[in-house]
From Swiss-Prot:
It is a multi-pass membrane protein. The chain crosses the membrane at residues 69-91, 114-134, 200-220, 244-264, 266-286, 320-340, 349-369, 382-402, 439-459, 471-491, 498-518, 524-544. Keywords: Ion transport, Membrane, Potassium, Potassium transport, Transmembrane, Transmembrane helix, Transport. Belongs to the HAK/KUP transporter (TC 2.A.72.3) family. Residues 30-51 are annotated as: Disordered. This is Potassium transporter 6.
Length: 748
């Protein structure tokens, strides 16, 4: 199987040099694929090779960005824009960190110790780990958990029986956006390639991490909006907590309901809002430091952490669950890197976000040293009275921006999960013609809305919601540390001792926080686990069902002899038929059912397999791998390759145009000259006689002899997901008038 246009492919092997040109597709099939097929070059004297011109269609203007060198001004502008997209969650954490601390009879030693913990947690976790280290592990500019995973799979051949399937092909390493493997693999790389259990463990870690991030999409809006709205209680004794909860729930419902309109119309306000927010909290922080306790910045010395734990012991350790909230949203620096670039995110964090947060927390600590009784309302109590209402408005707007960032991130995660085949197909709508990353998933939106409102109403704004949020945050941090350690050894070729030191150092920090938070599981910390288990159950049920389906089709593929009989018994009619299948080799069983029910086959048969690679995007010239299926004329195999950021569909005629162009090239170059030209002409005219799509509508049924857990997953969970999520016809945007679904029952 060769990619079209590959100089090392069948064209060279056949001794017939073929020069590919990309041209603008016309409306006439015959002109596009036949009339311009061969141009005489050099007056037909035979001195120059024939020149073939093919159109690959408009559908594959892939959404990748060419490598670009950014000027200082461009980097600064991107950094400014990142304030509203990347730093909403991290920036609004001063609303709830100190108020989440429960420390009776706190004094200056306690507040200096907590401030020192916050400063060093922000420095070591956000600045050093994420801004300086994790941001380097991008997949050609794309960040996030899936980017780390795809980067690993580009360097490690996952051959085990893992939930997310990928059969590596030799052509993969030649892709533009596929990282090159080093010639001498490390021992860790060899271990991973030969250990299916290790591969499964890494895959499960990635899936858990993504499910935790989806849970953040429900927890962040709840805690951010509640914390912002609660400030109104400090100015009116008539407003009770139940009123705050109702108002917060209304704001959250409205926030989720407007998602269908997209964020493009209001996203231009996000960065100004967050810039105003950071300037405000920094200014108020400086005011509180000067007015209440100027020496508060001495907390930068870590010995105050020792004094804090020496005094409070277990009670002090229990408050780590509140301190960890200061880095909520730090993972967004990596997850949203694809929208900006590494330098802009680093500049924004180091020049605006980090200093503002340090000043804000220091100001609150200075205020609390003089007013320890205001701990539960630390943020709003520390705001000077004349600025209260302006800050209330800015805080509420900033909380909405923070919520929007995590909600949008949840949609992106779901989209990538669907592309990798580890989540059921849901509706994914693009809400912006300009920004490809702005998508909307209606089903996920309403699930998150219900969960978010239930959390808000259930916890009533108590400390439990902070504990739940903290558990989700620290788990994501731990999973990222684990994956980064593997990346350091396998991809960066870092010395094992240095990579091990990184792992042990951050495991010690995050593990300490984890031990504190796990004691809070019965008191609200169970919520992120419940959300994760729910989404993970969907993910694993779907991938297990798809795996069993592929195994069944591979075992029951149509053999060469049987296929020859099917062709001989079937009438061949003009036109082209595309069979969509998960099989990358062999004739799928759907052909058997189709021929038995129709008694005919088109003159051009194309078995199409959609293949998602562990790369962010696949270039247009790398899209198709095509080859003849067996020795029969008019039967071909096409593998359509996509990255996890590409959109897979067959809308309009563009997919067929591109596929036919690739088939014409292979037919003309690989076969003998006479028959090759005849076959190429047949392929070129087939679409004009009609194009049809055949797709399976399969039902898996597991026999009673199998163990009941697997039977429950297949017969109940997987079947439920099949019935209630989108079908392949809707996902691929097939023309219903040209599509035939073949129903089949697979007994496994």
């Amino acid at each position: 199987m060769v990619p079209p246009g590959n100089g090392n492919g069948a064209a060279a092997a056949a001794g017939n040099d073929v020069i590919l040109e990309l041209s603008t597709p016309g409306d006439d099939w015959s002109h596009e694929l036949q009339g311009d097929d061969v141009e005489a070059n050099g007056g037909g004297n035979g001195d120059a090779p024939p020149r073939r011109t093919f159109s690959f269609g408009q559908a594959y203007k892939t959404r990748h960005r060419q490598p670009q060198v950014f000027t200082v001004w461009q980097t600064l502008m991107l950094g400014y824009q990142s304030l509203g997209i990347v730093y909403g969650d991290l920036g609004t954490s001063p609303l709830y960190v100190f108020p989440s601390v429960v420390l009776p009879d706190a004094d200056a030693t306690d507040f200096l110790g907590i401030l020192s913990l916050i400063i060093w947690t922000l420095t070591l976790m956000s600045l050093v780990k994420y801004a300086l280290i994790v941001l380097k592990a991008d997949d050609h500019g794309e960040g996030g958990t899936f980017a780390l995973y795809s980067l690993l799979r580009q360097h490690v051949n996952f051959k085990g029986n893992i939930p997310v399937p990928l059969t590596r092909l030799e052509s993969d390493v030649h892709l533009k956006f596929h990282s090159k493997r080093r010639s001498r693999p490390s021992r860790l790389q060899l271990f991973l390639e030969n250990s299916p259990k290790a591969q499964l463990a890494i895959t499960i870690i990635v899936l858990i991490g993504t499910c935790m991030l989806i849970g953040d999409g429900a927890l962040t809006p709840a805690i951010s909006v509640l914390s912002a709205v609660q400030g109104i209680q400090s100015r009116s004794s008539h407003i009770k907590q139940k009123h705050v909860v109702v108002l917060s729930a209304v704001i959250l419902v409205l926030l989720f309901l407007v998602q269908r309109f997209g964020t493009s119309r209001v996203s231009f306000t996000f960065s100004p809002i967050m810039l105003l927010w950071f300037a405000s909290i920094a200014g108020i922080g400086v005011y509180n430091i000067v007015m209440h306790y100027p020496p508060v910045l001495k907390a930068v010395s870590p010995h105050y952490i020792y004094y804090y734990f020496a005094k409070n012991k277990r009670v002090g350790w229990e408050q780590l669950g509140a301190v960890i909230l200061c880095i909520t949203g730090a993972e967004a620096m990596f997850a949203d890197m694809g929208h900006f670039n590494k330098s802009s995110i680093q500049v924004a964090f180091s020049t605006a976000v980090f200093p503002s947060l340090i000043l804000a927390y220091s100001g609150q600590a200075a205020y609390l040293i003089k007013n320890p009784g205001d701990l539960s309302t630390a943020f709003y109590s520390s705001v000077p009275a004349p600025l209260f209402w302006p800050m209330f408005v800015v805080s509420t707007l900033a909380a909405i921006v923070a919520s929007q960032s995590l909600i949008s991130a949840s949609y992106s995660i779901i989209r990538q999960s669907i592309a990798l085949g580890c989540f059921p197909r849901t509706t994914v709508k693009h809400t912006s013609d300009k920004y490809e990353g702005q998508v909307y998933c209606p089903e996920i939106n309403y699930v998150l809305m219900v969960v978010c409102v239930l959390i808000t109403v259930g916890f009533q704004g108590g400390p439990e919601i902070g504990r739940a949020f903290g558990v989700a945050v620290i788990w994501v941090m731990l999973l990222t540390t684990t994956l980064m350690t593997v990346v350091m050894v396998v991809i960066w070729e870092v010395n094992g001792a240095l990579a091990g030191g990184f792992f042990v150092f951050y495991l010690a920090i995050e593990g300490t926080y984890m031990t504190s938070l796990m004691t809070k599981v019965p008191q609200g910390g169970w919520v992120p686990f419940a959300i994760t288990v729910a989404f993970l159950s969907v993910t694993l049920s779907w991938t297990y069902g798809r795996k069993k389906k592929r195994e069944y089709e591979a075992r029951h593929a149509v053999g060469d002899g049987e296929f020859a009989g099917i062709v001989s018994r079937s009438a061949r009619v003009p036109g082209m038929c595309l069979f969509c299948t998960d099989l990358m080799d062999g004739v799928p069983p759907i052909v058997r059912h189709y021929a038995a029910n129709t008694g005919s086959l088109r003159e051009l048969l194309l078995f199409v397999t959609f293949r998602t690679l562990p790369v962010r995007t696949v270039l247009a010239g790398e899209r198709f791998l095509v080859a003849r299926e067996g020795a029969r004329a008019g039967v071909y195999r096409c593998i359509a390759q996509y990255g996890y950021m590409d959109e897979q569909d067959m809308v309009g005629d563009d997919f067929v145009r591109a596929a036919v162009a690739a088939l014409v090239e292979v037919a003309a170059a690989a076969a003998e000259a006479d028959s090759g030209e005849e076959e190429a002409e047949m392929i070129g005219r087939a679409p004009a006689s009609g194009v049809s799509y055949v797709i399976g509508r399969t039902v898996l049924r597991m026999r009673r002899a199998r163990n009941w857990p697997k039977r429950f997953v297949i017969n109940e969970l997987y079947r439920f997901l099949q019935k209630n999520f989108r079908s392949n016809v809707s996902t691929l945007k097939l023309d219903h008038a040209k599509t035939l679904q073949v129903g089949m029952i697979y007994e496994i």
